[in-house]
Design a protein with these regions (language model features):
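N-terminal Rossmann-like NAD(P)+-binding domain of SDR-like oxidoreductases, especially those catalyzing
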Residues: 1-210
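Glycine-rich phosphate/pyrophosphate-binding beta-alpha loops
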Residues: 224
Length: 264
């Protein structure tokens, strides 16, 4: 038996990963305590997804655990034992605004929670791949220094710039920029994941995603803008655009495409 531990398993990427790797023959140990409801209110609750996973996936087991609780996490890792073959860490506090209001909670979930998972992986399954859903917010406001051209309907990177064709890559610095407290806690987690890979020779990887979307997203005004926009359109609720003359450009990535990249 192959076991995959997936945190944030009822969220957008975690649920997609749970279904995908279950279809590949993994038994999935899903960890999610619906903290998204605490962050954003009842409309953001992921309980509906948890119930759907438990109903539709034969080999899915759910653990309602806070990833800041190292002892509770340890019990899950020990139960998985030598069958633990993969860790996908999707759980996070994802809001800039919420992080500013509760920085200790934000850092505890994003940084300390990640450290707990890395250390348990090192202790119990050091050969298992550890996939971390980081964020493009690790770059802070550095992208704002790119040569931007204002067009009639959008801002666009100058076509002569190397990032124009394929977007920003890891050559962009994460230093000397304004990150928000959320971005800073994710930087800490991102660097920890890299360091465990290099220092302990573990198989770790960071995916610095942004504007991820899909049918499993419990979108709210503060997070999950495309899902929230669709919800507003369906319910005929006004949708508010903040700043930049409404010319922001976002390249949305479907959750299935990201999880397929995990597999590749």
């Amino acid at each position: 038996m192959k076991i995959a531990i997936i945190t944030g398993s009822a969220g957008l990427i975690g649920a997609e990963a749970s279904r995908f790797f279950h279809s590949k023959g993994y038994t999935v140990f899903g960890i999610d305590n619906d903290m998204r409801k605490e962050f954003f209110g009842d409309e953001a609750s992921t309980r509906w997804m948890r119930l759907d996973l438990e109903k539709s996936l034969k080999n899915y087991r759910h653990f309602e655990i806070d990833i800041r609780d190292a002892a509770a996490l340890g019990n899950v890792f020990r139960e998985a034992g030598s069958d633990l073959a993969l860790i996908i860490h999707c759980a996070s506090q994802p809001s800039h605004d919420w992080a500013a209001k509760a920085p200790h909670v934000d850092f505890g979930v994003n940084a300390t929670g990640t450290l707990n998972l890395l250390e348990l992986t090192r202790q119990t399954a050091p050969a298992a791949p550890f996939i971390f859903t980081s964020t493009n917010k690790v770059y802070g406001d550095t992208p704002n220094r790119l040569p931007l051209v204002e067009k009639e309907t959008r801002w666009e990177v100058d076509t002569a710039h190397p990032f124009f064709k394929h977007g920003i890559d890891e050559s962009m610095s994460i230093d000397q920029s304004l990150h928000s407290l959320f971005g800073a806690s994710k930087v800490a987690a991102d660097v920890l994941v890299q360091e465990y890979g290099r220092y302990f020779q573990m198989k770790t990887v960071c995916f610095r995603g942004g504007c991820l979307t899909g049918p499993g997203h419990s979108g709210t005004q503060l997070h999950g803008f495309l899902a929230y926009l669709m919800k507003c359109a369906i319910t005929k609720t006004p949708y508010k655009v903040f700043g930049y003359k409404g010319k922001q450009v976002r390249d949305n990535i479907h959750s299935h495409d990201l999880v397929e990249a995990f597999w590749q």
